[in-house]
């Protein structure tokens, strides 16, 4: 069974990705503890060493770019959530210090001047991802099946196509020989092309799914492998490779600061590769969101975190049950509910409901073609109640088909099941909580209700807008606030831009401050603002 490891004291005011002005508070008779540490970043994607020597870090899901000072450890936000740049995936600098960012979900390339002014250079590059600047020339790749490799006109003219029909090219670099090197994820190879024209050539193949390449100061090609978790040094003339480090799946990009090599990971971890297989953690990883939560029959807490699925161990560490590139992974996970015997019902951002057995590396899709799925709950009959936010519906998914239980809802997000089998749903767009089949509303006047759980005839709702946990009795329907100033939702004054998704890896993404209850009535909360998981208990 999971247990809390960090009491809620001043330590909740952690200098992470979320600006904390007030520590969380709870009503009398309750205690709040933190189970996982806050995350410093919203994951870590593209890396680039800036002209000031800092390491710039793109964070797709956070719509944020941060800069890390290696000498002090200081982490500054350069482009914040809710700002002009949306879902940045890779970065490059020109000779004047302008920062170019690919916005993978919006198909854009934007330019941020040293004074902070930002403008869109192009908005017609689907799955814009890899980017590099070389001798006044800007190159961009589309990370999709049938993607193109482009040279962009810095004045906004039509791009020049270097290559077409590429199977998902990614983060690229011009080598000492003047050729443009780029990983091709769909081919599991690294290619190169003359930027002045020519046919792509394969440099190395049979890799661990390369997703980024850079050159070290000695002219060696270095590449991260997203599937195998290896960092390889490759001879660009022969294709021979050496393993510099074996880390974990989910590596994303790399950068050199002088002779020092740093790599990024989906988890937000930044690792320095020291040579001879040794590594050093520069920034620790953490949860990217988190999203849905579920407690199994053994009392273990499972966490859906988009590209990862975790179980929280008793010592507070996270054990990976599966991730985007592991066998049987259903896809970008959002909602989760325990089914028993190591099996879970999950919803994905690709519009699928699946039964997932992480320890067997198996999954089975039971419904597909749905629009922005969020919470899932299991009825006593075995049916799965699912919130379909995009269609404004709650669905019942059974082996014999899918039935619409309610329609015309305003952004349904969270679902839970009462002891007598009724479905409770939160409507984030209407600020209310409804029990399906009832004539009235269970709770209204909320700002943005998301996660919902039922325990001991109490309905617990996370209001991510008000940053509160509200409880309402199913009988009296009297509400009361249990916790406030919770690290959920967006910071005050920030309106996040929509994350449209990046097929085939994910559909539209969005926050989900979930809540679930354990067998001992402990409440677990997805603190999606600071990237932690909290536990709320009644005092004995």
Predicted regions span which residues?
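Short loop/turn segments that connect beta-strands within beta-propeller blades
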Residues: 69-73, 112-117, 152-157, 193-198, ...
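Blade-level signature of beta-propeller repeat domains, shared across WD40, Kelch, NHL, RCC1
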Residues: 506-540
């Amino acid at each position: 069974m999971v247990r809390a490891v960090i009491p809620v004291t001043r330590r909740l005011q952690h200098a992470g990705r979320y600006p904390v002005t007030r520590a969380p508070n709870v009503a009398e008779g309750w205690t709040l503890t933190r189970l996982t540490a806050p995350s410093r970043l919203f994951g870590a994607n593209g890396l680039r060493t800036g002209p000031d020597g800092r390491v710039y870090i793109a964070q797709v899901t956070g719509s944020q770019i941060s800069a890390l000072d290696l000498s002090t450890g200081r982490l500054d936000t350069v482009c914040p959530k809710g700002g002009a740049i949306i879902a940045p995936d890779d970065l490059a600098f020109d000779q004047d210090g302008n920062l170019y960012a690919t916005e993978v979900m919006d198909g854009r390339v934007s330019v941020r001047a040293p004074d902070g002014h930002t403008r869109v250079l192009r908005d017609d590059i689907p799955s814009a991802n890899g980017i590099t600047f070389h001798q006044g020339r800007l190159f961009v790749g589309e990370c999709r099946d049938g993607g193109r490799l482009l040279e962009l006109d810095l004045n906004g003219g039509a791009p020049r196509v270097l290559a077409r029909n590429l199977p998902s090219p990614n983060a690229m670099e011009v080598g000492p020989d003047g050729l443009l090197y780029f990983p091709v994820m769909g081919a599991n190879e690294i290619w190169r092309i003359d930027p002045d024209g020519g046919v792509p050539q394969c440099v190395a193949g049979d890799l661990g799914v390369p997703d980024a390449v850079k050159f070290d100061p000695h002219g060696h090609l270095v590449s991260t492998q997203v599937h195998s978790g290896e960092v390889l040094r490759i001879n660009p003339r022969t294709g021979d490779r050496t393993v510099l480090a074996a880390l974990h799946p989910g590596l994303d990009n790399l950068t050199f600061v002088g002779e020092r090599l740093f790599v990024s990971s989906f988890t937000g971890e930044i690792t320095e590769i020291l040579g001879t297989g040794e590594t050093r953690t520069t920034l620790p990883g953490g949860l990217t969101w988190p999203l849905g939560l579920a407690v199994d029959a053994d009392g273990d807490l499972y966490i859906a975190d988009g590209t990862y699925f975790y179980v929280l161990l008793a010592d507070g560490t996270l054990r990976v049950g599966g991730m985007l590139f592991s066998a049987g992974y259903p896809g970008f996970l959002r909602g989760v509910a325990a089914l028993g015997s190591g099996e879970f019902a999950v919803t994905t951002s690709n519009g699928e409901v699946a039964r997932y057995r992480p320890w067997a590396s198996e999954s089975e899709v039971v419904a597909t073609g749905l629009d922005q799925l969020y919470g899932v709950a299991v009825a006593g009959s075995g049916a799965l109640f699912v919130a379909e936010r995009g269609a404004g519906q709650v669905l019942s998914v059974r082996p014999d088909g899918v039935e619409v239980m309610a329609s015309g809802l305003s952004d349904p997000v969270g679902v839970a099941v009462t002891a007598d089998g009724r479905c409770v749903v939160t409507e984030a767009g209407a600020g209310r909580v409804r029990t399906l089949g009832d004539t009235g509303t269970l709770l209204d006047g909320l700002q943005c209700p998301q996660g919902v759980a039922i325990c001991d005839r109490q309905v617990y709702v996370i209001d991510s807008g008000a940053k509160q946990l509200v409880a309402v009795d199913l009988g009296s329907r009297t509400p009361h606030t249990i916790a406030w100033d919770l690290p959920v939702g967006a910071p005050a004054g920030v309106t996040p831009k929509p994350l449209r998704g990046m097929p085939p890896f994910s559909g539209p993404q969005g926050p989900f401050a979930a809540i679930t209850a354990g067998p001992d009535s402990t409440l677990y909360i997805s603190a999606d603002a600071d990237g932690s998981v909290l536990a709320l208990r009644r005092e004995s």
